[in-house]
Swiss-Prot record:
Family affiliation: Belongs to the glycosyltransferase 51 family.
SUPFAM superfamilies hit by this protein: Lysozyme-like (SSF53955)
Membrane topology according to the record: Single-pass membrane protein
Enzyme class of the recorded protein, top EC level: transferase
Subcellular location, principal: membrane
Upper classification of the organism: Bacteria, Pseudomonadati, Pseudomonadota, Betaproteobacteria, Neisseriales
An example Gene Ontology biological process: regulation of cell shape
Signal sequence annotation: none
Species, as recorded: Neisseria meningitidis serogroup B (strain ATCC BAA-335 / MC58)
Name of the protein in question: Biosynthetic peptidoglycan transglycosylase
EC number per UniProt: 2.4.99.28
Gene Ontology molecular function: any one: pentosyltransferase activity
């Protein structure tokens, strides 16, 4: 019995260590190499297949300097205003999320920063549990320790979901506006950013009043968005 208990404890610990070693190796690789596809992309494409949707993956890597500053500012203004200064976690946002989750009795809000969102996109799935959030935090800490802010943001810009099968700034710019990501205007960047929290909902409701309102809010906040210091775009 004692041996069985030891195995029951050792097995999940071993899996955790192995997975994080695998993740860390990939984080090191992604400092210089673009991901072929992310875990979230694979999960989504499998989901679409199971739903009987005829969706092809549209994912086009674009270097950081060739993505519009307008889009960078819009995303920071909307998703993570403190991105340039924090170490991967917005503790005020996390505390607010914990309160909302406690009040609802479910894991709904995450207080996720851009770095945390990237950790999820690269390596995890869309499930909402405290275990998954813990793994997300561990990956975020590893990534922030060995990857500069520009690269984290570059990976994020290229992995965001914007429509059915459409991932990354370049694919989204071509899909919605038939232009490269480098040429996005402030209005276009704000509208793309407004889709980020619920891309598939807005894909099905493109004329949503909520989308228009969110676009206007992003436009107002863009002027105060702070990019990473090394960004000379």
């Amino acid at each position: 019995m004692f041996r069985i208990i030891k195995w029951l404890i050792a097995l999940p610990v071993g899996i955790f260590i192995f997975f994080n070693a695998y993740v860390y190796g990939n984080i090191i690789t992604y400092r210089a190499v673009a991901p072929h596809r992310t875990a979230f992309m694979s999960m989504r494409m499998k989901q679409f297949e199971q739903e009987g949707r005829d969706v092809a993956l549209d994912y086009r890597w674009m270097p950081y300097k060739r993505i519009s500053t307008n889009l960078k500012k819009a995303l920071i203004a909307s998703e993570d205003a403190r991105f340039a200064g924090h170490g991967g976690f917005d503790w005020g946002g996390i505390q607010n999320a914990i309160r909302r989750n406690r009040n609802s009795g479910k894991v709904k809000a995450g207080g996720s920063t851009i770095s945390q969102q990237l950790a999820k996109n690269l390596f995890l799935n869309e499930s909402r549990s405290y275990i998954r959030k813990g793994e997300e935090a561990a990956i975020t800490a590893m990534m922030e320790a060995v990857t500069d802010k520009d690269r984290i943001f570059e990976l994020y810009l290229n992995s965001i979901e914007w429509h059915y099968g459409v991932f990354g700034a370049e694919a989204a710019s071509r899909y919605f506006y038939q232009i490269p990501a480098a040429k996005l205007t402030k209005q276009q960047a704000a509208k793309l950013t407004a889709r980020v929290p619920a891309p598939l909902y807005y894909a099905d409701h493109p004329k949503s009043k909520r989308l228009r309102n969110k676009t206007n809010i992003v436009l107002k906040r863009m002027g105060s968005a702070e990019l990473p210091e090394s960004d000379t775009d």
